[in-house]
Amino acid sequence: MSEKQQILDYIETNKYSYIEISHRIHERPELGNEEIFASRTLIDRLKEHDFEIETEIAGHATGFIATYDSGLDGPAIGFLAEYDALPGLGHACGHNIIGTASVLGAIGLKQVIDQIGGKVVVLGCPAEEGGENGSAKASYVK
């Protein structure tokens, strides 16, 4: 089976559990830098799949970087996971979906990375809508 098919099979087989994660995050909207539930939920799923987790990234208590390294030469392929909500609007921005889909994509790719080499990285991006410490996205590139 091709690597692409292995990834697609993982996604198809597991998509409903990720939809459930997205719904749970949607039901508990958290503003920028307050995304305790959302970041913990995404981190827990990544840990279940052997990703190494760094937390409190770039001055953001709810930021994280999750890495799965095959140990083989190859590219680092990154996914940006946003998960903050809008004041008074909740997840009208869809970040519950964006964050969860990024984790699903990363874990899907992890299914073949030991065969093809490289590493998979998820940048957990709190406060994408801004906030007192600014967007984590901007902090990552400083």
Language-model features and meaning:
Residues 121, 125-142:
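Fold-level recognition of mixed alpha/beta catalytic cores in primary-metabolism enzymes, strongest
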